[in-house]
């Protein structure tokens, strides 16, 4: 079984990280974009099968999504589950875990944007419930711009049970809500932590909330305005990065 991915950044990411997954690359005839030309040159040098197509054919293959003149047919990444998570928890000796839990993010664009932010923030793993999450499809991969191949993406059968497991391994659970007694910027985030983000329509579910150690919110100047979940995720993640990297009066990104 194979899947299609499209876009310069997305295909380039697979070329860089796992070219053995690529079965064939479809490219637009007579490309003009210099980035695309450079990528095609690299692909040819790697002896990967290439087929030139009209833009109309590429539009059909991508269902009229923005393919930027290149589509790759690839072997999907292996699915990760609770076994992968448990192995990570048992062998996390030399790192301070930063995990992202997405509860009910069903919009592919939001999921892709969350994955991209997670990659930029150095998240070690994304955890989603098996029955309440968008699949990592071509749209998610395009929005994630290659990040979906770098951040481990774990689907779990029971999210509440998974949060209990994280606590057993001393992972502190912080949930994002619209209103609470604690604001994000006054919350300690430098310890092993899992940040829990919910859907825009209903937030994190009741059982998920009950398994959080702390519920916090992002203060906004307009109380009637709520943030897009991917924007809120980015704010949560980079407040964590800020706290972890801030040393001796300056931010140390070394």
UniProtKB/Swiss-Prot annotation:
One example GO MF annotation: rRNA (guanosine-2'-O-)-methyltransferase activity
Swiss-Prot/TrEMBL catalytic activity: guanosine(2251) in 23S rRNA + S-adenosyl-L-methionine = 2'-O-methylguanosine(2251) in 23S rRNA + S-adenosyl-L-homocysteine + H(+)
SMART domains: SpoU_sub_bind (SM00967)
Gene3D superfamilies, sorted: 3.30.1330.30, 3.40.1280.10
EC class name: transferase
EC number: 2.1.1.185
Main location: cytoplasm
Any one of the GO CC terms: cytosol
InterPro entries named in the record: 23S_rRNA_MeTrfase_RlmB (IPR024915), Alpha/beta_knot_MTases (IPR029028), Ribosomal_eL30-like_sf (IPR029064), rRNA_MeTrfase_TrmH (IPR004441), SpoU_MeTrfase (IPR001537), SpoU_subst-bd (IPR013123), tRNA_m1G_MTases_N (IPR029026)
A Pfam family matched in the record: SpoU_sub_bind
Ligand binding (S-adenosyl-L-methionine): 198, 218, 227
Keyword presence, Acetylation: no
Swiss-Prot/TrEMBL keywords: Cytoplasm, Methyltransferase, rRNA processing, S-adenosyl-L-methionine, Transferase
Localization (cell): Cytoplasm
Cross-referenced NCBIfam families: rRNA_methyl_3 (TIGR00186)
Subunit structure: Homodimer.
Function field: Specifically methylates the ribose of guanosine 2251 in 23S rRNA.
Sequence similarity: Belongs to the class IV-like SAM-binding methyltransferase superfamily. RNA methyltransferase TrmH family. RlmB subfamily.
Protein known as: 23S rRNA (guanosine-2'-O-)-methyltransferase RlmB
Organism for this UniProt entry: Blochmanniella floridana
Gene it is expressed from: rlmB
């Amino acid at each position: 079984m194979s899947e299609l991915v499209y876009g310069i950044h997305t295909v380039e990411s697979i070329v860089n990280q796992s070219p053995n997954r690529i079965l064939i690359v479809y490219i637009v005839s007579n490309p003009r974009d210099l980035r695309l030309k450079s990528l095609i040159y690299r692909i040819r040098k790697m002896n990967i099968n290439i087929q030139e197509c009209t833009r109309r054919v590429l539009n059909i293959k991508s269902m009229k999504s923005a393919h930027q003149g290149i589509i790759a047919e690839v072997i999907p990444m292996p699915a990760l589950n609770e076994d992968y998570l448990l192995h990570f928890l048992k062998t996390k000796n030399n790192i301070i875990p930063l995990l992202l839990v997405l509860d009910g993010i069903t919009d592919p664009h939001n999921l892709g944007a969350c994955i991209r932010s997670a990659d930029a923030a150095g998240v070690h793993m994304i955890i989603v419930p098996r029955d309440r999450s968008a699949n990592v499809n071509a749209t998610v991969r395009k929005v994630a711009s290659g990040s979906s191949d770098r951040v481990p993406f774990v689907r779990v059968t029971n999210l509440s049970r998974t949060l209990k497991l994280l606590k057993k391994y001393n992972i502190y659970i912080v949930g994002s809500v619209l209103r609470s007694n604690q604001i994000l910027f006054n919350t300690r985030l430098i310890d092993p932590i899992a940040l829990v983000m919910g859907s825009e329509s209903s937030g994190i579910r009741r059982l998920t909330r009950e398994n959080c150690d702390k519920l916090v919110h992002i203060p906004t100047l307009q109380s009637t305005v709520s943030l897009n979940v991917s924007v809120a995720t980015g704010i949560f993640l980079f407040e964590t990065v800020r706290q972890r990297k801030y040393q001796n009066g300056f931010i140390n990104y070394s």
